[in-house]
Amino acid sequence: MKISKRQQDIYEFIKSEVKEKGYPPSVREIGEAVGLASSSTVHGHLARLEGKGLIRRDPTKPRAIEILSLEDEAETPNVVNIPIIGKVTAGMPITAIENIEEYFPLPEYMAAGETNVFMLEIDGESMINAGILDGDKVIVRQQSSAINGEIVVAMTDENEATCKRFYKEANHFRLQPENDALEPIILNNVTILGKVIGLYRDIH
């Protein structure tokens, strides 16, 4: 998660005061600590910290600032905004703006250090035997080739991105679903958009 230097200073000051004194500082004390004379400016920074989930405030109480990650003293993991693709425009780069439906804030470690990644939301149950369920978001590293048996995202003749297991065979390509009730997709040509390297699932 990216925050400004001033917001980081404010966050660290609040955290140290809570740890040392057992209660948070006042807005005036925060301003004095980080060199801000205007209380409204301090309030603005606090609002942004709250919006990023780092603190929680009670507007009815002057000192009610709760640090949300104080329990484990762990740093908030960096977040990267990963494009979620939908319908793919032929001839365009996979992450071209025409293909992107939205951006998803993913903890950086889940991208496995890769920078050229995108996500695809799974629609249907074609990959359930591989543990990929309807509504899951697969994390995909962009690449144009694959080894037999790898799970890839490929482009169909209808310009839809589909997640299947890849096989290159004698005179065709086979995109194999991981669902015994479904038939494979057989193609003379295939455009591989990337290899699946991870999975994100919302637990409701």
Curated annotation (Swiss-Prot):
Organism listed in the record: Listeria innocua serovar 6a (strain ATCC BAA-680 / CLIP 11262)
Lineage, top ranks: Bacteria, Bacillati, Bacillota, Bacilli, Bacillales
Pfam short name (any one): Peptidase_S24
PANTHER family attached to this UniProt entry: LEXA REPRESSOR (PTHR33516), LEXA REPRESSOR-RELATED (PTHR33516:SF2)
Subunit: Homodimer.
Classification via CDD domains: HTH_ARSR (cd00090), S24_LexA-like (cd06529)
Catalytic activity, EC: 3.4.21.88
Role description: Represses a number of genes involved in the response to DNA damage (SOS response), including recA and lexA. In the presence of single-stranded DNA, RecA interacts with LexA causing an autocatalytic cleavage which disrupts the DNA-binding part of LexA, leading to derepression of the SOS regulon and eventually DNA repair.
Transport recorded as keyword: no
DNA-binding region location: 27-47
NCBIfam families with a match to the protein in the record: lexA
Stored Gene3D superfamilies: Umud Fragment, subunit A (2.10.109.10), Winged helix-like DNA-binding domain superfamily/Winged helix DNA-binding domain (1.10.10.10)
Protein name per the record: LexA repressor
GO BP terms in the entry: DNA repair; DNA replication; negative regulation of DNA-templated transcription; proteolysis; SOS response
Record keywords: Autocatalytic cleavage, DNA damage, DNA repair, DNA replication, DNA-binding, Hydrolase, Repressor, SOS response, Transcription, Transcription regulation
Residues with site note (Cleavage): 90-91
